[in-house]
UniProtKB/Swiss-Prot annotation:
This is 7-cyano-7-deazaguanine synthase. InterPro entries: QueC, Rossmann-like_a/b/a_fold. The keyword ATP-binding applies. Binds 1 zinc ion per subunit.
Length: 222
C-alpha cells in the first residue's frame, strides 16, 4: 500500500487533509510537532484523539523546542499578546518564522525513512492569516528542495488539497469526508475553551457559519 506522511496539528485543516489522504488510498503516517506553542497540550490531545479515531499506530510526535528560543511569534513568546481584534491585512504576530519550512523538512526525513511517496499538509492560502509559508508557491519550492536533497530514488510529492479553498468550503469538505470536527482544535490562546476571538477561532467560526454547520467544540465567546 502506498504511504503518505501527514503533518497533523490536530486542527481542522490538517485533519481534513488526513482524511483526504486516506480517501486517496494512502496508508497514513501522522507527524505532530510540539514546538512550545501556547496550546501544545491541547493540540497533542487532538492529534492523539484523531489518530485513535483513524486507528493509526505508527505516530511521530516530535519535540522542537527551539522555536521558543527564537521567539518572534505570539504563539511561542508569552510576552507577545495574541491579537483578538479581528483578522487584519499583513503578516500577524502569530506567524512563526519559517515554521512550515522546518515542519516539511522533518516530514521529508520521515517520508524518506518510511518510503512514503507523498506529504500532505493542510496549508490554506485563500482564507487565512496570510502566512508566507502557507502559499502554493512556497510549497512548490519546498518540494524542489526536498527532492534535490534526498536520495535519487526518493521522489516525494507535497500535496496541499486545501490551499485554494475558503474556510466554509473546508468545513463542507470535512463533512463530506466524515471528519470528526468536534475532535479538532484551532484556538491559538486557550486549552480548555476556545477563545472565539483570536484569528484562528474567528476564521473557523466564520467558516462554520457560512457553511451552515454547527461547531461543537466549546467556546468562551462566539
Amino acid at each position: 500500500m502506498k504511504k503518505a506522511v501527514v503533518i497533523l496539528s490536530g486542527g481542522m485543516d490538517s485533519t481534513t487533509a488526513a482524511f483526504i489522504a486516506k480517501s486517496e488510498g494512502y496508508e497514513i503516517i501522522p507527524v505532530h510537532f510540539n514546538y512550545s506553542q501556547r496550546t501544545e497540550k491541547r493540540e497533542l490531545k487532538a492529534f492523539n484523539d484523531i489518530c485513535d479515531y483513524l486507528n493509526l499506530d505508527n505516530r511521530y510526535i516530535i519535540d522542537i523546542p527551539f522555536f521558543k528560543q527564537i521567539g518572534a511569534s505570539a504563539l511561542v513568546d508569552e510576552n507577545i499578546d495574541v491579537p483578538v481584534d479581528g483578522v487584519k491585512p499583513g503578516i500577524p504576530v502569530t506567524y512563526v518564522p519559517f515554521r512550515n519550512g522546518i515542519f516539511l523538512s522533518i516530514a521529508a526525513a520521515v517520508a524518506e525513512k518510511e518510503g512514503a511517496e507523498a506529504i500532505y499538509i493542510g496549508v490554506v492560502e485563500e482564507d487565512s492569516s496570510g502566512y508566507p509559508d502557507c502559499t502554493e508557491d512556497f510549497i512548490q519550492n519546498m518540494q524542489k528542495a526536498v527532492n534535490s536533497g534526498t536520495k535519487p530514488e526518493t521522489n516525494i510529492e507535497i500535496k496541499t488539497p486545501l490551499v485554494h479553498l475558503k474556510k466554509e468550503d473546508i468545513v463542507k469538505t470535512a463533512v463530506k469526508y466524515n471528519v470528526p470536527l468536534h475532535l479538532t482544535w484551532s484556538c491559538y490562546k486557550n486549552e480548555d475553551e476556545a477563545c472565539g476571538v483570536c484569528d484562528s477561532c474567528r476564521l473557523r467560526l466564520k467558516g462554520f457559519e457560512k457553511a451552515g454547520i454547527e461547531d461543537r467544540i466549546p467556546y468562551k465567546q462566539k
